[in-house]
Amino acid sequence: FKDNLTWLKLNRVKPQAVHDLYFSTFTIKGSSAAYPSSIRFDNYYHSGTIIRSEDNQLTPLIIYDGEALDGSSANILINNIASGGTIPSQLNDKLSSFILRRGHMATLAVNENGTGYSKVFIASEEDLEVHSLPTKLNNAVSVIRVIPWNVVSKIETGGDIAGMNNSWFYRWNNLGVSDVQREYVPMSWGKGGADDENDIQNYRSKYKTTHILGFNEPDDCNGQSGQYNNMCDPEVANGFYENLMKTGLRMVSPAGRQGAALDWINTFNQFAIQND
């Protein structure tokens, strides 16, 4: 690979097989590839792989202060939190349009800490051009995070179980690690995984992770996460869930018991909408 935006897509060879059979054949800008420091083997649905360089100097997002990709512009580094005055070219609260290069995900939010109104944009297989931001984001973005997008299938496991032919897994906690074959999706089981800056830094540091799961059965006031710290109150849970927005990851709602979607989750969602 000579260009850090180039990729090789194999539709029917899984990441582990690519790593084991072909790893030694790849070079990055003339040097032998080193996994995971200079090369990535990302999932491509159930049976494929996207191979590309791992380069922290890559700038897959170009932002503009005018609509239709016009006006002053700035390049945003991958795997970096750009917020407030650290957004280049003095474009804090001035973003109106952007180009996101294929294979990447960008999270934009209005508050410098990542909370408040936000939106995740995904350029899965083609560059994404947004010529006009949604009204609530236009000239209001104060934090940006761009990370590699990983295209997993629907097949997953609850638990780090080998040999299940899945492309992602979770463990009801935030202690897991992705491997070459699977993306690990951390869960904030309860309040303890969402109440301080160390939690946020932990989630941000997860290699290959694009999502974070909300709380485990917070609707159960007598069991699971809902029995602790008044988490079965949807408003209380919403406050800690908001803290997870600081990760810049794509967020998944809390997982309630059967029937919670019509009651607890609905109430939780209404609080989230009210609070942006």
Residues covered by each model-derived region:
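Glycine/small-residue-rich loop that forms an oxyanion/phosphate-binding "nest" at active or ligand-binding sites
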Residues: 210-237
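Alpha-helix termination/capping residues and helix-transition junctions
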Residues: 92, 138, 163, 206, ...
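A general structural motif
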Residues: 5, 23, 152, 166, ...
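Noncatalytic carbohydrate-binding groove/subsite architecture in carbohydrate-active enzymes
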Residues: 176-198, 232-276
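N-terminal carbohydrate-binding/catalytic regions of secreted carbohydrate-active enzymes
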Residues: 152-212
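Compact beta-sheet-dominated domain cores in extracellular/mature segments
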Residues: 3-155, 161, 176-178
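Active-site-proximal beta-strand/loop segments in catalytic clefts of secreted hydrolases
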Residues: 66-67, 111-112, 157-162, 170-175, ...
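Structured segments of extracytoplasmic/periplasmic soluble domains
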Residues: 101, 112, 215, 243-247, ...
